[in-house]
Amino acid sequence: MYKGLTQNLQAAIASGKNPDVVQMGYSFLNYAAENFQSVNLNDAFAKSGDPNFLKDNFLPNVLELAQTEDGKQVGLPYSISVPVLYYNPEIFKAAGLTEAPKTWAEVKTYAKTIKDKTGNMGFFMQEYADNWAQQAIIESNGGVMLKKVNGKVQAGFDTPEAAEAFQLMADMVKDGSGLHATNEEGFQAYLSGKLGMVCTTIGKRANFEKTAKFPVKVATFPEFEGKPVRVAAGGNFLMVFSKDAAKEKAACEFIKYLQSPEALVKWSTGTGYLPPRKGIAEDPKGFKKMAEENKNIQVALSLMPKAVKWASFPGANGLQAEQMLIDVRDVILSGEKPAAEALKETAKKVNDLL
């Protein structure tokens, strides 16, 4: 989704038709900052007469989600999501499972139990055209997506920790308890009561709760035993590409409206995303009532302190590097190659690009 938006933006700018406000995926932060001329939002809000809007309304760690390494505020976080584990309590009951899994070892065991006792598929992890969910499982096992060597960004996923995380997914597919499929197929299997667990964004919550034929339950992102959970903040941030001062000021006013408590609660209600603005979760006009009444939202909010920046491939070849890691996911899950071998080969190709 965000890759397509980025490519559309590239085409629009090339034709001289700059959009004023754009939603950009966090994983394309470095690519967008290095390849597109955007407006520095600190400067823009200062010129619009509200120089303290950002620091007064957003926590520093939230603002950092849309900052380059040198601290330039190229955007403003708008939608925030974290990966969670949705499960079907009716399938769990039929399989004799009484509580949600807390570790990835338990997820694997639960998936096999569900398959053996109910005939339903046990587990599916989202397969969007990005590496967001994969980053969470790699880094929760102590690995990293990207690293710096002598000041240069390189692939960091050619490690035993990353291979173990990927291989766990592949092993579930191999034994028939895990599903390797399109998102549409995986999500539909869950919603129709034929899949026990799906790991995907809390941004799917509203749709799942409305569509499922059973009460949707959410559990926190599982851990690798003894290791801290680290989940990438997903979603998107707002960038401004206005060419003149009047449009730039209007863009700032539009962003302030989008970030108002009333607008954010509508956005969160409709999408399932978590709001980025400080205090919204406690604001009676904002998210407070909704969060208090929905335990699934409470689970997602509890993951916010464990959120880290979504790894963003830099440079002109950033999109191509991102695609290589997406492609190797299919190689591993299909059983074509073991995770360790496939990741090592892909890391070398990515490093040659970067």
Which functions belong to the PLM regions below?
Residues 1-57, 90-95, 99-102, 196-197, ...:
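Extracytoplasmic "Venus flytrap"/periplasmic binding protein-like
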Residues 69-78, 83, 93, 105-154, ...:
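Extracytoplasmic/periplasmic solute-binding protein
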Residues 42-58, 123, 143-164, 210-211, ...:
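Short, solvent-exposed loop/beta-turn-alpha elements that line the ligand-binding surface or hinge
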Residues 296-346:
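C-terminal capping/gating helix-and-loop segments adjacent to ligand/active sites or protein-protein/ligand interfaces
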Residues 29-82, 108, 217-219, 301-304:
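Hinge/lid segment of periplasmic solute-binding proteins
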Residues 255-279:
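Periplasmic-binding protein-like
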Residues 29-31, 136, 167-253:
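Extracytoplasmic/periplasmic substrate-binding proteins
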Residues 111-112, 151-180:
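Glycine-centered hinge/linker elements that transmit conformational signals in sensory
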